[in-house]
Amino acid sequence: MADSSSSLPPLCEKISYKNYFLRVVDLTILGFLFSLLLYRILLMNQNNSVWVVAFLCESFFSFIWLLITSIKWSPASYKSYPERLDERVHDLPSVDMFVTTADPVREPPILVANTLLSLLAVNYPANKLACYVSDDGCSPLTYFSLKEASKFAKIWVPFCKKYNIKVRAPFRYFLNPPAATESSEFSKDWEITKREYEKLSRRVEDATGDSHWLDAEDDFEDFSNTKPNDHSTIVKVVWENKGGVGVENEVPHFVYISREKRPNYLHHYKAGAMNFLVRVSGLMTNAPYMLNVDCDMYANEADVVRQAMCIFLQKSMNSNHCAFVQFPQEFYDSNADELTVLQSYLGRGIAGIQGPTYAGSGCFHTRRVMYGLSIDDLEDDGSLSSLATRKYLAEENLAREFGNSNEMVTSVVEALQRKPNPQNTLANSLEAAQEVGHCHFEYQTSWGKTIGWLYESTAEDANTSIGIHSRGWTSSYISPKPPAFLGAMPPGGPEAMLQQRRWATGLLEVLFNKQSPLIGMFCRKIRFRQSLAYLYIFTWGLRSIPELIYCLLPAYCLLHNAALFPKGVYLGIVVTLVGMHCLYSLWEFMSLGFSVQSWFASQSFWRIKTTCSWLFSIPDIILKLLGISKTVFIVTKKTMPKTMSGSGSEKSQREVDCPNQDSGKFEFDGSLYFLPGTFILLVNLAALAGCSVGLQRHRGGGSGLAEACGCILVVILFLPFLKGMFEKGKYGIPWSTLSKAAFLAVLFVVFSVGN
């Protein structure tokens, strides 16, 4: 219960950033874009079809920059003061923590175990926490790893809290040896804890190599004759916290779950798993707040739960309007500089409107909001309005909306009325938990429609996020130092392309479903600028077409002897526009501590993913809208550095995180993802070669130096592909891709020259 005294300092404060200089720069770039469009309109009759195509592409780019300017206009974030929480709140609320995994091959069980251990060790009363791991792959190996991790947690959690360890994921913490100034007691405990973690890692590694012996144990009987897409519901209470209030070294509840899957039933991928987590946790612990993290995003800040509670428990007029608290997704490797910059500027910009979007991980949700409440259903004090009480608490309505389970209905009523959760034995809820995991349980209910994580898109995070904001809720953004959660990005290559395609396809699905911001901005409670922010995100896939065309236009104009850019003094519009944008984006990177090399790599990868990966989201969404095929959620392969090298020598955290000699190289395979990029590169190289040997006579009104510079710029941006033409192995472009791209490039050159 929170102390309502207004004389005490606040638990959090909103920080608004007003940088008028950056607003001027954004508007200036927008002005140059509009000037270029106006110039093309005025000279449209004097030029050919190339001019029209360029105008259409630049119109799309101008629209995107208009959206960016709107987003970045009033950035904001929150600063929390978790050290004030204990003196302000006498009884901290419970929190249910969710971890999702789906494939023990692509998501190593030891990585999932480390994420689990980091959550179990956070600085929060153990009797107020419960951790649920959803294993959509129904893997005995994953269960074994987590069961072993729960044993190690009885050593790890007390060690972390005794010495106030900062990094609470063992695989990261043990990368650095203890300082020489540490006490002998600490050094002894450190060695013991490290040895136990190494034993855990070896047991998991041995089980990975030969898991047949797992079938012999009684605890693994439920996993016999199971397949990832065909198995019954499994719910196991791995560890139950029976300690009292104030027992610091206790380990929180830990429950393993795997919902039923059958080949003939839709399971809705991660969104379906999240909704099962909500139901099981509602039956067992029913905490008012829920944290969800991906299996590779460990808790890096021990006070992360307290920081989120500072937002939810702050006494103010709008405290009850906050639906979720989102922490930025940050990474310990060198592959995520671009995302860090994107979150720092655009993320804070969206946070200053109606609140950040839900990013799928590192987010604290309020259970009542996930149960479908609208902002209009609450009184000023956060209690249900009389109309909402009649609407939601009628038993027949609840059964129809939430499913035919008396225990589930009871837990929903308690959650909506904010009743304290009685400390029941978890085993008493096992039968009901099994029931709500059946494939048919959601049939003719509102799960995935208006309740829980929303279906109809593989980007369940964005779909759910706009659904929450459309009901009038706000959200909050906290970016603490050190970062609250850390993970690893897939390296540039097939896995990155796969991930980007999945994101772009899922976002386009939301753009064309009933949650579309094009609908919401006019008839829902979402703010207009928030709708524009979502529109910017959901159109990622659509950008692939104008960007692909614009990468080919300079080459076409050189080969065809046609003008693409303005002539004379008007060329200054393009030169100034390109120069300002480059300097502006470079400043954004360098102001966050990144290098020029990092900035260039980001610019290059942005062009590559847009023209290569995002491009495939277009046919994906077209085929889905036509009912020909359905989009599929493919799990991205997760990797983790090893604490010990093969020779047994330790690697430091710096050695693991910093790029090695191969980290900057782009990886290729024979998939179609790399065909567009190779084609673009070959076309521009051919145009430059043709220009240098005089394939076309360049007369006064045709192409010239500006178009040649455009081709050079495209080649520079696709430098990883140029290097890939001369590399071998996974860093080289396969011959099959090169031959296909070369054939298409020849057709393009013949068409351009002869047209």
Curated annotation (Swiss-Prot):
It is found in: Golgi apparatus membrane. Coiled coil: none annotated. Its EC number is 2.4.1.-. It is a multi-pass membrane protein. GO terms for biological process: cell wall organization; cellulose biosynthetic process. Expressed in young seedlings, primarily in the vascular tissue. It comes from the Eukaryota. One of its GO terms (molecular function) is cellulose synthase (UDP-forming) activity. The active site is at D136, D461. Its main location: Golgi. It is an enzyme of class 2 (transferase). The chain crosses the membrane at residues 24-44, 51-71, 534-556, 569-589, 615-635, 674-694, 702-722, 733-753. GO terms for cellular component: endoplasmic reticulum; Golgi membrane. Keywords: Cell wall biogenesis/degradation, Glycosyltransferase, Golgi apparatus, Membrane, Transferase, Transmembrane, Transmembrane helix. Thought to be a Golgi-localized beta-glycan synthase that polymerize the backbones of noncellulosic polysaccharides (hemicelluloses) of plant cell wall. Belongs to the glycosyltransferase 2 family. Plant cellulose synthase-like B subfamily. This is Cellulose synthase-like protein B3. The gene is CSLB3.
